[in-house]
A protein has these predicted regions:
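GNAT-family acyltransferases
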Residues: 1-96, 101-104, 117-121, 125, ...
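Glycine-rich acyl-CoA binding loop
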Residues: 109-112
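Conserved beta-strand-loop-alpha-helix junction that forms the acyl-donor binding cleft
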Residues: 133-143
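Conserved active-site tyrosine of GNAT-family acetyltransferases
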Residues: 146
Length: 168
């Protein structure tokens, strides 16, 4: 588990991801943490399915690089966001980050804080030299999260903007 000022970040196991897809209430009971009902639905559910396929083929020590980390508001003891990488660092030491937070919690700095905590964790591992992210030009909030965490825009070809943050 990672801690920041207002958040606990809990790396979910493959079994916990599967449970969350089947029943968010069951996962909530297992973790003893209330979870926003739609946190693992829609695009998140599709991404979790992809994460599970990747995790199935990797040794357990690499799972934290592939899973979602559950963002829990310390004051409310409520899980309201997800943040994670899309795999272990590649040969160039690069990983891609993705994230999402429930709309009720948007605009309060939680995503910036969660991404920052996970970046600190990633860069504490020698094999991680850079983190990339992709976002749509219209997603101003996501772009602000990245810039506040030291990312720089590196390309804007196609429908997405690519950002990169290198180890300090």
């Amino acid at each position: 588990m990672l801690k920041s000022i207002r958040l606990n970040l809990i790396p979910l196991t493959a079994q916990q991801l599967e449970t969350g897809l089947q029943s968010i209430k069951q996962l909530s009971m297992e973790l003893n943490i209330p979870i926003i009902a739609d946190l693992m639905s829609g695009v998140a559910a599709e991404t979790i399915t992809k994460k599970l396929a990747i995790m199935h083929d990797l040794p357990p020590e690499l799972h934290p690089w592939c899973t979602y980390w559950l963002m829990v508001d310390i004051c409310d003891n409520l899980a309201m966001g997800l943040v994670g990488f899309k795999g272990a660092p590649d040969a160039d030491g690069s990983v891609e980050i993705g994230y999402g937070v429930n709309s009720i919690y948007q605009g309060r700095g939680y995503m910036t804080e969660g991404v920052g905590a996970l970046l600190e964790w990633a860069f504490s591992h020698a094999e991680c030299r850079q983190v990339t992210a992709f976002t749509l030009p219209a997603n101003i909030a996501s772009r602000k999260v990245l810039v506040k965490n030291g990312f720089r825009e590196i390309s804007s070809a196609g429908e997405e903007i690519q950002y990169r943050r290198t180890r300090d």
